[in-house]
C-alpha cells in the first residue's frame, strides 16, 4: 500500500500498481503531504511579481518559480541542485515541483467536510443517527448539543437552544457538557464505539417489523461496517487541517495593465486564511463567546465554499456576480478534470481541413495536401535531412523546410511512404469514425477522401471537415496498418454486413449498366468471348442493354482452396452484365451479376466476394466497382425533369371514391350512428387505403413501359424513367418520396403526433394550395425541431451505453457453460422478417440440435454457425436453436469468446482481448443519431398502417394453433376465448413460415392441423372493439343495470334497433357510483349457469363505454357476442417514439400503465370493490390466494373463473421488464428487450446484431438482491455484484455452509454505470460528488479492470494489445527472473538499430 501522493512525488512513473484505494485523509496524513503551512492570504507582490513569503504562492513552501534558481537569486544553475538557500529558504530545484508540492492550513477550530455532511444521504447524519437539520443547527452555531449528560436528566446528542441551555446551566451547573460547532460533532463521532454499535444493530434488525425501519437500520449498519472495514476514523469527516493545492494548479497570471487573471480557488483560499487568522487572534484575546462563535461559523462557511461552493446556502460570487469555481466544480461535469483532461485529451501531430471527393484513389489511400503533410511530418523530415547530410543542424533543416526547397519535397515523399495517417470525422459515433489511410501528396488545400468510406464516416462533401493524426511509434503505425486501415474494415461491426458499399452515383451507374432493354440495337448477337463484347460495344454496334449470347469461362475452387476448375458455357445475358463480369474476382459465379444490380444486390455481391475470395480480392473489386459505376453513371446521362413525375390517370377517381366514403361516414356520425372516435379512425383508414391505391397506380405507371420487340409485338418492360431508375436502384429517393411528388401527399400529422383527418390530395407536381401548404408545414417544422433535440439525446444515450459496457472485454476462450438463449425466427404476420438462419449466424450452438423425427444430432454443441451451416438450416426443418449468449456466459470478469461467437467486423470467432462492450454500445448508439436525423425526410406524411382485421394465409401449409382456448359457435365457426393465442402456418419441412397473433373474440374458419391453400382467409375480427363472448349458453339476466344510473339506451335511426351503453363511473349520478353493471346467464330452471369444471357462476362485468348487444331475458348461444368495448385510437409511428423508447428500455423504466401480470398460477375471482379499485384474487392449487388491487379504468382482460399461468397478462399494457425478469426469468427478459429494441430499429431499416443488445443486457443484470443471507457476509436486502455472490456461494459450498439466496435485479444503464465496482469509472460518468463521497467513506478499491479507469490513470487499456501487456506485466512481477522474451521496447530498439544499419548500407551504395 503506497500513498498515491508519494507515488506521484517520486518522479519515476515506473511504479507498478494494480489497484487504487480512496479513503478519508487523517490530519496527520495531510500534514505529511505538506511542505509547509500557509499562514498569510497574500499571493504575489504586484510590483516585483515575486511570491510573498508564507503566502498562497510562497516559494519556500512550494518550490522555486524559475528552474534551478532561488528566489533572491543567490543560487542559479544546475550545479547548486538540492541546496536550500539560507537567505530566502527556497530549495534549488525544477519549477515543476510547484505543480505537485502541497501546503496546509492549520485550522483554529475543527470544520465539518461539506461532502460528508450535505451529500445525500448525509454520512455524518447517518453515522450519528441524527437528522441533517439537527446537525446543521449544531455546526452553524444555532443550537447546543449535549455531549456528556453526566448525572442530569438530559440525553446524549440532545439539542438545546440558547434559552434551554441557560436553563440547564442554572439547574445542573457544570455536571453536563454541551457544545456547539464542529467540535461537538467531532466529540460525538469519537464517542461512538463501532464494534458495539454494529453488534447492537445486527441484533436489532431481525426484531423489527416495519419495512422502513429495517431499511434505515441496514443502511446505517452498512455505513458502520464500511468504517470498520476500511479503517477510516469517523472523526476524520471533521477536518482540523486543510490541504492547499499546489500553486501551479491554481495559477495567477499577470495581464497587461497591472491586472491579474486568477483561479477562483485563490479567492476561496484567501477567504479561509483570513477568517482562520482572525479566529486565532480572537481566541488569543479571549474574545466574547458570541464573536468567536460567529467567526467559527464564517470559517465553516468559507471552507464549505472552497470544497463545494453553492452546496449550502448561496454560492459565494466573485466580482462579476459569477459563482466561484470550487474544488468540487473542478472535477465534475463536462469541463471538469475527468471528462476534459483525463478521458479526452488534445493531441499534437494533427491537422484539419475540408474534404473533397477522391474518385481516383484506391481504398487504402487518402489525398493529403502537401502543406499539411509538411507540417505534420516535420520532425521526421528534420531527422532525415540531418541524417542525409543536407542540413548540419536542426536549425538549418528548419530553414530548408521553411523555404520549401525541392529536396524537402523529395524527403517528404520518402518519409510519407508507407506511413499511415488517421482520418477522423466528428462526431465519432462508432469505431469506423477513425480509420487509417496511406497519404498521397496532392496540390491544393483540401483532404481527398475515398467515396466508399463516406458511409462509415457518414461524411458528405458539402463542407465537412476532417482531422488528420499521425501515429508516431512503431507499434502505433503497426496497429494503424493492421487494425485501422480502411481496407481492413470492410464489414460493419454492428451487423457484419459490408459497410464499404457503393451508394448514389455508383449504384445508378451499375444498375443502368445491368438493365435490359427489349429491342435494343444489337439484340440477339452472339459473342465468343468478353473481348469481342467490349469491341462491339466500343464501336457502338451493340447497345449496353441489348440481350446477347456470350461464351464465358467460370472458375471454381474446391472447398480446401485447392485446384481451380473451369467450365465454359454460353450465357444468355446483356452486354452490360457481361462487361461487369470482367471485374468480378476469379472464382465467383456469373449469376451473381446476371441481374439488375440494385443497392441490395451490390451489397450482397460484395458480401459474397468477401466470404469466398477473402479480403484482398474484395477491396480490389470494390474499387473496380466504384470506378465502373462512376464511369457509366456519367455515360448514361441520367437526369430528371418535371415530366418524369407521371401522375396516374386513376388518381381522380380514387380520390373521389374516398371522398364519397368519408361523406357516408360523416352522415352516419351526424345521425349518431358512430362515435367521434370511430369516425376519426374510419376516416383515417379510408384515406390511408386511398393513398396506397394512388401510390400503387402511380408506381405501376412509372415503373412499366411498353416496348416493341424484334417480332414487332408490344411487350411490357421495366421503364427507363430516370426517377424510377434512381428509386428502384436505391441510388436516391424512395417510393414514399415519389408518392409525394407524383401521387398524393396523403395524411399529415400535427406537431403532437395526432393525424389530421383531411389529407393533402395534391402532390408536389400539381402544387399545393395555401391550406395544404399550411397543413404540411406542421409536420415539416416538427421534423426539423426534432432533429436538433434528438442529436443531443442520442449522443447522451451512446455515452450511457459506453459507460455501462466499457469494462466488458473478451477475457477467455470458453467458459464451458451449457446455458444459452433459444432463438426463433422473427415472424410478423405472414412474413418471416428475420429468418432463423439470419438470427443464429455467427453464434455458437449451446446444445446439440436434434432432428425431431429421427433424434439424429444435426449440429453438435460448440459449433460456430457460419454461412455454410446457415444455408443448410433452411432444409433441416429446425424451428429453434439454443445458442450461447453473453447473457448466460459464466466468465467472472468479461465474456468468453464462445458465448460471444463471431466478431462481426472480421467474420471469424472473436479474439481474446476484443472490447465487445464498447463495440456493442457504439453499434446501438450510432444509428440512434442517424435515425433521429432522419425524421423529417418524409415531411411529416403520416405513415399509418390500416387496422388489421383478418388473417389471410400467404403461403399454403398446415395450420397450427398455439396456446389457444376456443368455443364452437352454432354456425360451426370457432371463437377464440383466450388471450395470448396465435395461429401459425408451417411449410412441408415443418418450419413455421407465418405467425399471426389472434385477439380474444376472433372467429376462426379453420381448425388445428388443417391444410390451407395460399390466400385463404382463416380468421377475422373487429379491430375497433373488444368483444365479450359467451362461453356457455343461457338466458340473459341484467344485474345493476338501471336506465340513467348505470346505462343509457339510444335508438339507431337507420335500423331502428336500440342499443345499450354503460355509463362510465365518473359520469354516473352519485347513487349509481357503487353499482357494478354485469350480465349473468341463467339455465332453463332459472339457476345460475356455472363455468364448466367449476362452481363459479358466469358473470360478465361490463366496464364503462361498453355497448351491450343483448336484451334482458334474451337467449345467448355459445360463442355469441354479449357486449363490445370500444378500443382507443392509435397514434402515429415515428422514431420520435423510437429513440426515447430505446432509452426507456435500456434505463429499465417502468412504463406508465404497465401490463398487469399474474404473480402465480391459479384461478381468477373478483372480490369486493374499493373506491376506484377492483379486487382480483388468484387462487393457486396449493398455497395462499393472492390479492391484487387493480384501478377501475384498466381494461381487465380475464373473466371470473379463468385459470391463468404465472406471468400471463391480466390487464393489457406495455410490459414492465422488471416483472418479466421476476416472473419469467432472465431468458424471457433478454428476449423481450432484444425484440422491443430491434422493432424500433427495424422500423427505420437499421440492422443491428442481437448480440450487441445482449451484451448491454448482461451489464444491466450485474447486480442481485440478497433475499436470504445464509452464512454469507451479505446483509439481507443488499444489492451485490452477481459475480461476488457466485464466488461467495462457491466458497460457502466448499465449507458446507448455507449459501446466500438472491433475486436477479435489472438496473437501468445509468444506475448500472453508477453501481459499478470501479469508483473511478462511476465518478467520471455522473454524480461525481456522490460517487467519490461514498467511495471515500467505504474505503473502496478500484482494481482497474475496465477501460475507463485505466485511461484515467494513464495506462494502456486492458483490451486488444493492452490485455497482453498487462498479463505480461503481472507475470514479470510474479517472477522477476524470467525476462526471457524481451519487451516491445527492447524489440523496437533492436529493430531500429538493424534498420539504421541497413539504411547506412543503402546510402553507401
UniProtKB/Swiss-Prot annotation:
Keyword Disulfide bond: no
Keyword Zinc in annotation: yes
Reaction(s) the record says it catalyses: RNA(n) + a ribonucleoside 5'-triphosphate = RNA(n+1) + diphosphate
InterPro entries: DNA-dir_RpoC_beta_prime, DNA-dir_RpoC_beta_prime_bact, RNA_pol_asu, RNA_pol_N, RNA_pol_Rpb1_1, RNA_pol_Rpb1_3, RNA_pol_Rpb1_3_sf, RNA_pol_Rpb1_4
Keywords carried by this UniProt record: DNA-directed RNA polymerase, Magnesium, Metal-binding, Nucleotidyltransferase, Transcription, Transferase, Zinc
Residue sites binding Zn(2+) 1 per the record: 70, 72, 85, 88
Cofactor: Mg(2+); Zn(2+)
GO MF annotation: an example: DNA binding
Disordered as annotated region, ranges: 1363-1388
Pfam families named among the record's database cross-references: RNA_pol_Rpb1_1, RNA_pol_Rpb1_2, RNA_pol_Rpb1_3, RNA_pol_Rpb1_4, RNA_pol_Rpb1_5
Binding site for Zn(2+) 2: 815, 889, 896, 899
EC number: 2.7.7.6
Domain of life: Bacteria
Cofactor note: Binds 1 Mg(2+) ion per subunit. Binds 2 Zn(2+) ions per subunit.
SMART domains given in the database record: RPOLA_N (SM00663)
One GO location term (cellular component): DNA-directed RNA polymerase complex
BP term (GO), one: DNA-templated transcription
Reported function: DNA-dependent RNA polymerase catalyzes the transcription of DNA into RNA using the four ribonucleoside triphosphates as substrates.
Oligomer and partners: The RNAP catalytic core consists of 2 alpha, 1 beta, 1 beta' and 1 omega subunit. When a sigma factor is associated with the core the holoenzyme is formed, which can initiate transcription.
Matches recorded under NCBIfam families: rpoC_TIGR
Similarity section: Belongs to the RNA polymerase beta' chain family.
Protein name: DNA-directed RNA polymerase subunit beta'
Native source species: Chromohalobacter salexigens (strain ATCC BAA-138 / DSM 3043 / CIP 106854 / NCIMB 13768 / 1H11)
Lineage of source species: Bacteria, Pseudomonadati, Pseudomonadota, Gammaproteobacteria, Oceanospirillales
Gene, per the UniProt record: rpoC
Amino acid at each position: 500500500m503506497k500513498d498515491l501522493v508519494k507515488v506521484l512525488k517520486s518522479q519515476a512513473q515506473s511504479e507498478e500498481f494494480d489497484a487504487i484505494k480512496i479513503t478519508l485523509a487523517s490530519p496527520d496524513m495531510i500534514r505529511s503531504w505538506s511542505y509547509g503551512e500557509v499562514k498569510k492570504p497574500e499571493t504575489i507582490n504586484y510590483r516585483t511579481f515575486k511570491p510573498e513569503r508564507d503566502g498562497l504562492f510562497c516559494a519556500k513552501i512550494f518550490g522555486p518559480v524559475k528552474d534551478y534558481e532561488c528566489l533572491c537569486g543567490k543560487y542559479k544553475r544546475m550545479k547548486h541542485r538540492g541546496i536550500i538557500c539560507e537567505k530566502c529558504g527556497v530549495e534549488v530545484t525544477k519549477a515543476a515541483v510547484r505543480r505537485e508540492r502541497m501546503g496546509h492550513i492549520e485550522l483554529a477550530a475543527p470544520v465539518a467536510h461539506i461532502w460528508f455532511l450535505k451529500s445525500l444521504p448525509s454520512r455524518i447524519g447517518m453515522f450519528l443517527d441524527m437528522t441533517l437539520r439537527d446537525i446543521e443547527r449544531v455546526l452553524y452555531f444555532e443550537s447546543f448539543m449535549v455531549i456528556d449528560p453526566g448525572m442530569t436528566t438530559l440525553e446524549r446528542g440532545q439539542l438545546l437552544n440558547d434559552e434551554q441551555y441557560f436553563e440547564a446551566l442554572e439547574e445542573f451547573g457544570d455536571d453536563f457538557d454541551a457544545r456547539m460547532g464542529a467540535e461537538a460533532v467531532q466529540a460525538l463521532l469519537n464517542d461512538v464505539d463501532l464494534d458495539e454499535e454494529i453488534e447492537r444493530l445486527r441484533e436489532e434488525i431481525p426484531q423489527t417489523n416495519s419495512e422502513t425501519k429495517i431499511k434505515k437500520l441496514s443502511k446505517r449498519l452498512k455505513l458502520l461496517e464500511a468504517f470498520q472495514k476500511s479503517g477510516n476514523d469517523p472523526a476524520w469527516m471533521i477536518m482540523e487541517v486543510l490541504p492547499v493545492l499546489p500553486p501551479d494548479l491554481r495559477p495567477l497570471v499577470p495581464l497587461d495593465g497591472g491586472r491579474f487573471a486568477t483561479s477562483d480557488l485563490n479567492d476561496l483560499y484567501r477567504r479561509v486564511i483570513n477568517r482562520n487568522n482572525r479566529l486565532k487572534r480572537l481566541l488569543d484575546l479571549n474574545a466574547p463567546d458570541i464573536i468567536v462563535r460567529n467567526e467559527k461559523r464564517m470559517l465553516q462557511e468559507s471552507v464549505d465554499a472552497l470544497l463545494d461552493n453553492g452546496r449550502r446556502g448561496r454560492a459565494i460570487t466573485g466580482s462579476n456576480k459569477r459563482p466561484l469555481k470550487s474544488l468540487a466544480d473542478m472535477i465534475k461535469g463536462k469541463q471538469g478534470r475527468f471528462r476534459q483532461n483525463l478521458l479526452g485529451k488534445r493531441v499534437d501531430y494533427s491537422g484539419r481541413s475540408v474534404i473533397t471527393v477522391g474518385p481516383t484513389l484506391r481504398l487504402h489511400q487518402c489525398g493529403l495536401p502537401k502543406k499539411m503533410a509538411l507540417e505534420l511530418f516535420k520532425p521526421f523530415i528534420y531527422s532525415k535531412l540531418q541524417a542525409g547530410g543536407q542540413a548540419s543542424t536542426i536549425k538549418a533543416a528548419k530553414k530548408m523546410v521553411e523555404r520549401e526547397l525541392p529536396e524537402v519535397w523529395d524527403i517528404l515523399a520518402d518519409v510519407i511512404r508507407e506511413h499511415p495517417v488517421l482520418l477522423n470525422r466528428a462526431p465519432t459515433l462508432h469505431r469506423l469514425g477513425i480509420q487509417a489511410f496511406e497519404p498521397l501528396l496532392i496540390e491544393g488545400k483540401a483532404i481527398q477522401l475515398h467515396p466508399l468510406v463516406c458511409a462509415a464516416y457518414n461524411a458528405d462533401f458539402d463542407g465537412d471537415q476532417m482531422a488528420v493524426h499521425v501515429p508516431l511509434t512503431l507499434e502505433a503505425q503497426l496497429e494503424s496498418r493492421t487494425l485501422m486501415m480502411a481496407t481492413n474494415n470492410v464489414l460493419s461491426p454492428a451487423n457484419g454486413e459490408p459497410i464499404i458499399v457503393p451508394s448514389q452515383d455508383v449504384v445508378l451507374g451499375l444498375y443502368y449498366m445491368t438493365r435490359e432493354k427489349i429491342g435494343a440495337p444489337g439484340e440477339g448477337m452472339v459473342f465468343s468471348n468478353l473481348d469481342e463484347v467490349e469491341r462491339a460495344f466500343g464501336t457502338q454496334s451493340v447497345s449496353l442493354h441489348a440481350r446477347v449470347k456470350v461464351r464465358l469461362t467460370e472458375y471454381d475452387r474446391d472447398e480446401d482452396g485447392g485446384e481451380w476448375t473451369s467450365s465454359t458455357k454460353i450465357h444468355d445475358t446483356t452486354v452490360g452484365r457481361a462487361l461487369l463480369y470482367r471485374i468480378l474476382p476469379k472464382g465467383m459465379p456469373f449469376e451473381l451479376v446476371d441481374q439488375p444490380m440494385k443497392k441490395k444486390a451490390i451489397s450482397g455481391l460484395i458480401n459474397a466476394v468477401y466470404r469466398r475470395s477473402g479480403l484482398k480480392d474484395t477491396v480490389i473489386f470494390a474499387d473496380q466497382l466504384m470506378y465502373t459505376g462512376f464511369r457509366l453513371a456519367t455515360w448514361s446521362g441520367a437526369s430528371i425533369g418535371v415530366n418524369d413525375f407521371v401522375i396516374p390517370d386513376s388518381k381522380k377517381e380514387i380520390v373521389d371514391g374516398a371522398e364519397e366514403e368519408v361523406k357516408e361516414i360523416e352522415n352516419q356520425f351526424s345521425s349518431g350512428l358512430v362515435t367521434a372516435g370511430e369516425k376519426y379512425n374510419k376516416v383515417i383508414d379510408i384515406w390511408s387505403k386511398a393513398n396506397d391505391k394512388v401510390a400503387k397506380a402511380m408506381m405501376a405507371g412509372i415503373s412499366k413501359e411498353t416496348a416493341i420487340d424484334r417480332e414487332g409485338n408490344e411487350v411490357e418492360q421495366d421503364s427507363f424513367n430516370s426517377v424510377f431508375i434512381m428509386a428502384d436502384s436505391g441510388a436516391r429517393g424512395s417510393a414514399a418520396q415519389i408518392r409525394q411528388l407524383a401521387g398524393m401527399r396523403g395524411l399529415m400529422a400535427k406537431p403532437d403526433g395526432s393525424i389530421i383527418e383531411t389529407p393533402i390530395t395534391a402532390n408536389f407536381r400539381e402544387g399545393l394550395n395555401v391550406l395544404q401548404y399550411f397543413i404540411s408545414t406542421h409536420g415539416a417544422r416538427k421534423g426539423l425541431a426534432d432533429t436538433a433535440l434528438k442529436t443531443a439525446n442520442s449522443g447522451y444515450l451512446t455515452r450511457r451505453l459506453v459507460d455501462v459496457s466499457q469494462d466488458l472485454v473478451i477475457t477467455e476462450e470458453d467458459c464451458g457453460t451449457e446455458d444459452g438463449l433459444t432463438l426463433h425466427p422473427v415472424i410478423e404476420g405472414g412474413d418471416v422478417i428475420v429468418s432463423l438462419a439470419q438470427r443464429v449466424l455467427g453464434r455458437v450452438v449451446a446444445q446439440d440440435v436434434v432432428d425431431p423425427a429421427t433424434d439424429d444430432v444435426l449440429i453438435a454443441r460448440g459449433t460456430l454457425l457460419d454461412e455454410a451451416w446457415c444455408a443448410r438450416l433452411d432444409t433441416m426443418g429446425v424451428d429453434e436453436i439454443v445458442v450461447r449468449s453473453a447473457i448466460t456466459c459464466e466468465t467472472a470478469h468479461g465474456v468468453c469468446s464462445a458465448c460471444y461467437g463471431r466478431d462481426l467486423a472480421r467474420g471469424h470467432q472473436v479474439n481474446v482481448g476484443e472490447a465487445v462492450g464498447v463495440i456493442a454500445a457504439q453499434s446501438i448508439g450510432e444509428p440512434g443519431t442517424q435515425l433521429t436525423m432522419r425524421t423529417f425526410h418524409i415531411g411529416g406524411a403520416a405513415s399509418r398502417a390500416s387496422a388489421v382485421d383478418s388473417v389471410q394465409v400467404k403461403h399454403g401449409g398446415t395450420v397450427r394453433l398455439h396456446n389457444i382456448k376456443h368455443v364452437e359457435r352454432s354456425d360451426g365457426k370457432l371463437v377464440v376465448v383466450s388471450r395470448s393465442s396465435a395461429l401459425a402456418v408451417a411449410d412441408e419441412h415443418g418450419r413455421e413460415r407465418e405467425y399471426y397473433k389472434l385477439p380474444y373474440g376472433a372467429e376462426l374458419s379453420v381448425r388445428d392441423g388443417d391444410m390451407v391453400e395460399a390466400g385463404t382467409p382463416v380468421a377475422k375480427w373487429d379491430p375497433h372493439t373488444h368483444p365479450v363472448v359467451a362461453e356457455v349458453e343461457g338466458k340473459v339476466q341484467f344485474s345493476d343495470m338501471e336506465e340513467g344510473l348505470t346505462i343509457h339506451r339510444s335508438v339507431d335511426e337507420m335500423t331502428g334497433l336500440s342499443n345499450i351503453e354503460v355509463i362510465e363511473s365518473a359520469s354516473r349520478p352519485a347513487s349509481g357510483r357503487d353499482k357494478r353493471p354485469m350480465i349473468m346467464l341463467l339455465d332453463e330452471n332459472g339457476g345460475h349457469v356455472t363455468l364448466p369444471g367449476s362452481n363459479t357462476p358466469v358473470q360478465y362485468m361490463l366496464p364503462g363505454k361498453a355497448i351491450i348487444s343483448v336484451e334482458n331475458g334474451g337467449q345467448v348461444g355459445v360463442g355469441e357476442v354479449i357486449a363490445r368495448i370500444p378500443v382507443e385510437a392509435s397514434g402515429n409511428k415515428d422514431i420520435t417514439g423510437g429513440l426515447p423508447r430505446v432509452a426507456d428500455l435500456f434505463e429499465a423504466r417502468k412504463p406508465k400503465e404497465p401490463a398487469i401480470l399474474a404473480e402465480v398460477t391459479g384461478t381468477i375471482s373478483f372480490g369486493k370493490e374499493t373506491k376506484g379499485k377492483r379486487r382480483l384474487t388468484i387462487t393457486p392449487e396449493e398455497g395462499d390466494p393472492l390479492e391484487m388491487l387493480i384501478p377501475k379504468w384498466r381494461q381487465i382482460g380475464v373473466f371470473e373463473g379463468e385459470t391463468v399461468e404465472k406471468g400471463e397478462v391480466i390487464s393489457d399494457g406495455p410490459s414492465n421488464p422488471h416483472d418479466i425478469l421476476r416472473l419469467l426469468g432472465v431468458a424471457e427478459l433478454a428476449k423481450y428487450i432484444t425484440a422491443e429494441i430491434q422493432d424500433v430499429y427495424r422500423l427505420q431499416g437499421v440492422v443491428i446484431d442481437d448480440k450487441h443488445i445482449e451484451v448491454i443486457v448482461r451489464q444491466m443484470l450485474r447486480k442481485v438482491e440478497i433475499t436470504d443471507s445464509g452464512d454469507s457476509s451479505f446483509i439481507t436486502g443488499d444489492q451485490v455484484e452477481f459475480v461476488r455472490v457466485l464466488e461467495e456461494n462457491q466458497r460457502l459450498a466448499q465449507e458446507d455452509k448455507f449459501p446466500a439466496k438472491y433475486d436477479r435485479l435489472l438496473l437501468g444503464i445509468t444506475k448500472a454505470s453508477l453501481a459499478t465496482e470501479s469508483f473511478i469509472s462511476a465518478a467520471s460518468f455522473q454524480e461525481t460528488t456522490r460517487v467519490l463521497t461514498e467511495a471515500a467513506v467505504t474505503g473502496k478499491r478500484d482494481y482497474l479492470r475496465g477501460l475507463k479507469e485505466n485511461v484515467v490513470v494513464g495506462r494502456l487499456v486492458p483490451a486488444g494489445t493492452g490485455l497482453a501487456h498487462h498479463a505480461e506485466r503481472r507475470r514479470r512481477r510474479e517472477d522477476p527472473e524470467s525476462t526471457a522474451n524481451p519487451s516491445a521496447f527492447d524489440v523496437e530498439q533492436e529493430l531500429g538499430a538493424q534498420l539504421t544499419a541497413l539504411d547506412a548500407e543503402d546510402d553507401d551504395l
